[in-house]
Amino acid sequence: MPTNFAEILNNCVESINSFLWGPYFLITLLCGTGLFFTIKLGFVQIFKFKMGLKELFGNFSLHGEAAGKAGMSQFQAVATAIAAQVGTGNLVGATTALIMGGPGAIFWMWCAAFLGMATNFAEICLAQIYRTKDDSGHTIGGPAFYISRGLKGKLAKILAGFFAIAIIIALGFIGNMVQANSISDGFKGAFGIPQWITGAFLAIVCAVIFIGGVKAIARVAEKIVPIMALLYVGVGLTIIFLNFQQIPEAVSLIFRAAFDPSAAWGGATGASIAAAMRYGIARGLFSNEAGMGSTPHAHAAANVKHPVDQAVLGIMSVFVDTFIVLNITVFVVLTANVISFENGKAVFTGITLVQEAFSSHIFGKVGGYSFVAICLFFFAFTTILGWYYFAEINVRYLLGAKAVRAFQILVVVFVFLGSLQKVDFVWSLADMFNGLMVVPNLIAIIILSPIVAKLLKDHDAGKEYDVKDYLK
C-alpha cells in the first residue's frame, strides 16, 4: 500500500504511462498514423529524401531564404527543430531504452522513426498552411493553430487548448527540468562542479537568450547545431571504427533481441517484446519528436515559397536525430562492450554508460567523461532553447504576448530547480505529458490529411502555392 502522497502520485503516473505507452494505445496510434501517411503520401520519406538532402545542405551552405522581420530563415527553422530534437534523448534516452527494453528497443526506435518521417512531413505542411501572426507581429504556428483553424468548432478549440496546456507543461517546465538535470549531473561527474553552480549559470544564460526572443534563439541554434552534431558524430564514428570487429554482432543483437529479448546479455534485462516496443518508441519519440507536435512550431516560422520545401526538412531532421546522432550513441555503447549486470541490475546507466563507452578508446576516463559532459551541455542547452520557444508559442496562443514575460521567469526557475533535483519521477511525468500531447495532434493531422495530400500533389505538378487553396 502507498504510504505517502509522493508514492501515490508516482503510482498514478506509472498507471497512466502503462496505458498510454502499453502495446495497444499510443504505440499503435503513432505507428498506425505513420503508416497511414507513408501510404497516403506515397512513401514520401523515401521519394522526397533526395530533395530533403538538397534543401538541408543547400541551406547549410547558403542559409536559404531570408528570415524576414517576423519569422526565421529556412535554415534557422530546421536548426531550431534539430536543436530541440537532439538532446538528452540521444544520449540518456538511448541508453535507457537499451537497458530497460534491451537492444531490441533500438529496432523499434528505427521503425518508429521511419514512419515518423511521414508524420512529421504532414505536421509541418499543416503548420505552414495554418500559421498566423500574433499581436506582436510574430509569425507563429503549430498544432494548436491547425487544430483550432482547421477542424473548427467548440471541440476543436477544446482540443487545441488541451494540446497547448500539455506542451507548456511537458516541454516548458518538465522537459526542461530533465535537460537541466542531465547537464548538472554530467558536469558534477566530469568536473566536480556543484549542481547549484551549473544550474545558476544555465538559468542566467537562458534568461538572456529568452529576453532576446525568437531571433536570438534562431541565431544561437544555427551556429551551435552544426558544430555540436559534427563533433559528436565525428568522435563517435572514430570509436566505432576502432571497434569495427564488434559491429556485425551489435547489428545482429539489435535484430535478434527485437523479437527475442532473452538473446541479449543472457536475458539479464528481463525485458519482453512489449517492453522493447514501449521503451524503443517512447524514448524514440522523446528524441525525434515525430507525431508529438513540437517541431512544427519552428518550421511554421520559416520563410519559404512552398510548405513542401520546408516539410522535406522535417524528414531530414528525424533522420539526423535518430539514424545518425542516436545511432552513434547506440553503436558506441554496444561496440565498446561496457554494458554489464550485477544481481539483475545494470552496473552503468544513463549518461554514465555513455561516458564509460567514450572512455574506452581515445580519451581515457577523464577525457571520455569530460567530452560527453560538454556534448551533453550543448545538446541539452539547445533543446532547452527549442522547447522554450515551442512552449512560448502556445502561451501566446492561450494568453497572448502579455503573458510571455511571466512564462520566461517561470521557465528560468524550473531550469534552476531541475539542476538540483533527482528526476527519475520527472522522466515519468515527461513520458505522460508527451503522450497527452500526441493524442489531439494525431487526431487533427489524420482528419486534415486530405489537405496534405493535395498540397503534395500540387507541388509535384508544379502548381504555384496559394494558401487560400487549402484553407477550409
Can you say where each PLM-predicted feature lies in the sequence?
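Transmembrane helix-loop junctions in multi-pass membrane proteins
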Residues: I8-L9, L41-Q45, N90-A94, L171-I183, ...
